[in-house]
Amino acid sequence: GGKSFVGTEFTYNDTALRDTDEDNHTLVSENQSVPVGNSTYNCYVVKSDPKSKRNIEFDYRIQYFDKNTYIPVKIEYFDKSGKMVKKMEVTKLEQLAGVTGKKHNLRRVAEITNMLTGRRSVLTILSMELDKELKATYFSQNWLSTGKS
C-alpha cells in the first residue's frame, strides 16, 4: 500500500499505473491552464475516487492531464477532510524515439512533495531504451525481487 519507494516520498502506488476501472472519475474542467516547473500546460482536470480504499493512502486525487500528450503533469492527493496531503508534478516531459523510430512522450523528471512534512523527492530518469525486446527472465519472481537472474 503506502510503503515508501526506496526511502523517498514516492510510494509504490505512486510509481505504478492504476487501472482506470479501479476509480470513479469526474471531469472537473476541460480547459485549465496549469503551471508546472518552467512550463504551462493546457489540461483536462479529473477527480478520481478509488472504488476501494484498501491499500490506498489517500481518499481521492485530482489529476491534471496535458491535452497534447494525455500525461498527468500534476496529481494532488487529498485525505478524507479534503486536505491536500501530497502533490506530484512532472517537471520535465520529453519526446523520445524508440529503436523502431516510433516517438513516445515520457515523464523524464517527477517531483513529489509531502504536504504534511514538507519533505520532497525528485525522480529523474537519466537514460532509457524504448521499443527494445526484453528477456523473459526480467519478469521472473527472482529478478523482480532481487534484480538478479
Regions found by a protein language model. Give the residues of each.
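Gly/Pro-enriched, hydrophobic low-complexity segments
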Residues: 1-18, 37-138
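A short, amphipathic edge element
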Residues: 15-32
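Short, low-complexity, Pro/Ser/Thr/Gly-rich segments in the mature regions of secreted, periplasmic
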Residues: 135-149
